[in-house]
């Protein structure tokens, strides 16, 4: 369960049924150090480097625009206090594939950013929860992260849903997913006019209810403005994980009945790409639980048919979970870990084999995004990390 993705005032309502009870950010802060030499620490301004160490384990999403050299990472900023005494956030920007970074403490002070999506080198969107009401919020930049405009509709102040993830396939079309209220039911919202109006979908697939709800959505990936795959599950349940898809802009939705989702509590993130022949290939990252010990195990599932059927391609018995996944191609993916010292896991052969990168800290909510098959950016282990050689993976022959 992504406890830290839920507004802090709402955690207590569901924590009693949680299966993942790992506390984020309580480990003693440490200087960043990943295993190996293929991921290098970004040279950040002292205020941001210090913030990543002293305020470790928070929401630190990263988004790169494929085919460019542009990425944005949202990081804590201890010199930017908001909401009285809370540590604020800043946007770190690179326009040279991670070689240099510039920080901008211009995010709205009215809400805590949980998720980020960049559609172009100029247009990015963030979503999160407001300090005032705990309701959903959204902001946009049109100058590559230098300045941000709060575009939260007034009627969201008491909205009965939250946004855990956002994906913007175009500069004006964005999709957000999360839960509805305290009952763990799914929510999906969409704008097609740059945030002027938003549609809350009421036609999502239903499943039998439990005392703690049906399922919530944690991640979404869209290969076009109309074609998206969203993933999630029931926090505190025993599975199956849930995957819903649309190919017509949300007019209709399909619920995957794949057997591979059974026993998987939740998928936390998903990355989809167009595949040869016109289909869609997706990789979903999440968590299952060992049948003998009950400990959490991070895993990756793959789908070759637009999210309809899935097969497990990776599992790590590390008492943690994969929090984020990014695929530059249908063969090259990196997943970022949480709740363990497995910081990253990557494949260059479509999931047949994986390489892991460990950290010297635990309880990280890792995030990763790839510019290309060779260049990716990760926020994990109290730092921003960059690889320019696909993390040292040997390309598949």
Give the location of each predicted region.
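Residue-level hotspots at or immediately adjacent to binding/recognition sites across diverse folds
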Residues: 33-397
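N-terminal export and membrane-targeting signals
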Residues: 2-16
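Accessible peptide chain termini
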Residues: 1-2, 397
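C-terminal region of N-terminal signal peptides and the immediate post-cleavage residues
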Residues: 22-38
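Bacterial N-terminal signal peptides
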Residues: 13-25
């Amino acid at each position: 369960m992504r406890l830290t993705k839920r507004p802090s005032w709402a955690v207590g309502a569901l924590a009693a049924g949680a299966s993942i009870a790992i506390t984020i950010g309580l480990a003693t802060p440490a200087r960043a150090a990943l295993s190996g030499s293929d991921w290098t620490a970004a040279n950040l301004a002292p205020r941001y480097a210090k913030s990543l160490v002293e305020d470790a384990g928070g929401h630190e999403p990263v988004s790169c625009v494929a085919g460019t050299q542009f990425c944005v990472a949202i990081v804590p900023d201890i010199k930017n206090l908001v909401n009285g005494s809370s540590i604020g956030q800043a946007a770190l920007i690179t326009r040279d594939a991670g070689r240099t970074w510039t920080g901008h403490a211009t995010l709205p002070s009215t809400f805590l950013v949980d998720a980020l999506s960049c559609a172009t080198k100029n247009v990015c969107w963030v979503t999160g929860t407001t300090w005032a009401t705990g309701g959903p919020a959204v902001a946009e930049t049109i100058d590559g992260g230098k300045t941000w405009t709060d575009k939260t509709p007034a009627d969201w102040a008491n909205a009965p849903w939250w946004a855990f993830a956002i994906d913007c396939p175009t500069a004006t079309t964005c999709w957000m997913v999360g839960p509805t209220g305290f009952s763990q039911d799914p929510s999906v919202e969409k704008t097609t006019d740059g945030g002027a109006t938003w549609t809350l979908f009421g036609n999502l697939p239903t499943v039998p209810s439990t005392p703690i709800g049906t399922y919530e959505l944690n991640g979404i990936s869209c290969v076009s403005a109309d074609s998206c795959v969203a993933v999630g599950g029931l926090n505190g349940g025993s599975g199956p994980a849930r995957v819903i898809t649309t190919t017509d802009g949300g007019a209709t939705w399909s619920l995957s009945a794949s057997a591979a989702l059974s026993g998987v509590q939740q998928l936390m993130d998903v990355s989809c790409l167009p595949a040869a022949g016109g289909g869609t290939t997706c990789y979903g990252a999440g968590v299952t639980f060992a049948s003998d010990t009950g400990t959490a195990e991070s895993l990756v599932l793959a789908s070759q048919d637009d999210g309809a059927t899935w097969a497990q391609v990776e599992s790590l018995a590390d008492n943690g979970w994969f929090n984020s996944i990014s695929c530059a191609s249908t063969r090259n993916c990196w997943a970022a870990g949480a709740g363990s010292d497995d910081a990253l896991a990557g494949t260059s052969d479509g999931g047949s084999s994986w390489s892991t990168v460990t950290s010297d800290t635990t309880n990280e909510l890792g995030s990763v995004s790839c510019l290309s098959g060779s260049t990716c950016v990760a926020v994990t282990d109290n730092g921003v990390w960059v690889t320019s050689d696909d993390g040292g993976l040997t390309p598949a022959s």
